[in-house]
Amino acid sequence: MSKMFETLHMYFQYPFVRYALIVGVLIALCSSLLGVTLVLKRFSYIGDGLSHVAFGAMAIASVLNITNNMLFILPVTVVCAIFLLRAGQNTRIKGDAAIAMISVGALAIGYLLMNLFSTSPNISGDVCSTLFGSTSILTLTKGEVWLCAILSVVVVAIFILFYNKIFAVTFDENFARAAGTRANAYNLLIAVVIAVIIVLAMNLVGSLLISALVIFPALSAMRLFKSFRSVTISAAVMSVLSATAGILISILVGTPVGSTIVAVDIAVFLVSYGIGRITGR
């Protein structure tokens, strides 16, 4: 046990390890807050589609040699989030068809561009890191950490500020409309915030594993609690603890950060599911 703590203490002497833990906790908190809303509104598929869009945008940013690629990826992902939300309300283009079209197209174009215009000698490694977050969170600069921190604070502030409206739109959108709530505006706000979370989470778990970071804590909390507030708070706690444990385990064992965090999330869900079955929840 003492050797384990000595190893962790040694690693935490390096700034990039501290940056990884800070960003991991912030992203886990943000993703869990909106994850409950996405699951209840059946918007989970939007997160998966936007993660592929973010991958394509990252490929374009690398081709254009954009230094801070997050400033390019973020607006592109937000625009696509708005489009997907509008597509879901379009009777001609079904929402699931639009998401499948955009996600697969963005993934294919992104990989094609990385092969055609890549300046890196290790394309496979770059793609693996982008898709699964194997090393990208360990290469964060101080500027990127500050950007993640600022965006995370904005996301949490938006959720707290509009909590009642988000709650109303989540549980009964038709009633919320009848009560005078601008449901379309708040659905748009949710989509934009999710786009921001997707971009932030790419460095943590990679574009293919982002949905797990959003969905698993919410599902785990729903097995144990019933009220929206309790589920949201417990999902946030589970997500932060899972991210922290995943990062620490990956440091000690040498496993990929993103996959380890998702594995911990899965373990927490299985435990929650078992407790829910035993208690009859």
Language model region names:
Residues M1-L29:
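Membrane-interfacial amphipathic/re-entrant helices at transmembrane-helix boundaries
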Residues T255-V262, I266-R281:
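Cytosolic-side transmembrane-helix boundaries in multi-pass membrane proteins
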Residues L140-P217:
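Helix-loop-helix "hairpin" substructures at the membrane interface of multi-pass membrane proteins
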Residues V36-S51, F55-P121, A221-I233, S250-G254, ...:
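Short loop segments and helix-boundary regions at transmembrane helix junctions
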Residues T7-M10, S103-I160:
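Transmembrane helix-bundle core of multi-pass membrane transporters
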Residues N203-S259:
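Transmembrane alpha-helical segments in multi-pass inner-membrane proteins
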Residues V23-S31, A57, A61, F72-C80, ...:
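Alpha-helical transmembrane segments in multi-pass membrane proteins
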Residues L21-V25, M70-P75, A97-M101, V145-I150, ...:
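Hydrophobic alpha-helical transmembrane segments
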